[in-house]
């Protein structure tokens, strides 16, 4: 069964704004963009997830709300010759602890504050750590025009197989 957190990003009253679910079709190929022959977008995405796991496991004080489930996607703009020009979009969805409601604010206000905190931490903690792992020509692709989608469906408390096992009841 799909968690309500994911379903909220899919089911919409306006049919023109229906979400596509929590799915994506990805493909890969060998390339000389990176030393490990992975496409640069995939390599960056993997680095984001490895670094999130590193923070969660070994430097938990930086982002103490992190939980194990996460996914990422990076979109890169290329010129006509296949040379990367810039990173266009970074998507990071990370499971987190339940939001704590402070006295005097609603659950919705607490949720929004936590979403803002996660987005800020992704930009100020995660991104610089990942960027530092790459050579100068890749670091130059990071700029202030990157579009960030951090937990774009909102709350992501229920993760792993309990959150979304899909049609096959597996994750």
Locations of regions flagged by a protein language model:
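Glycine-rich, mobile lid/loop segments that gate access to catalytic sites or pores
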Residues: 1-161
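Compositionally biased, intrinsically disordered low-complexity regions
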Residues: 11, 165-168
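Conserved mixed alpha/beta catalytic, RNA-binding, or beta-rich assembly cores of soluble enzyme
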Residues: 127, 167-171
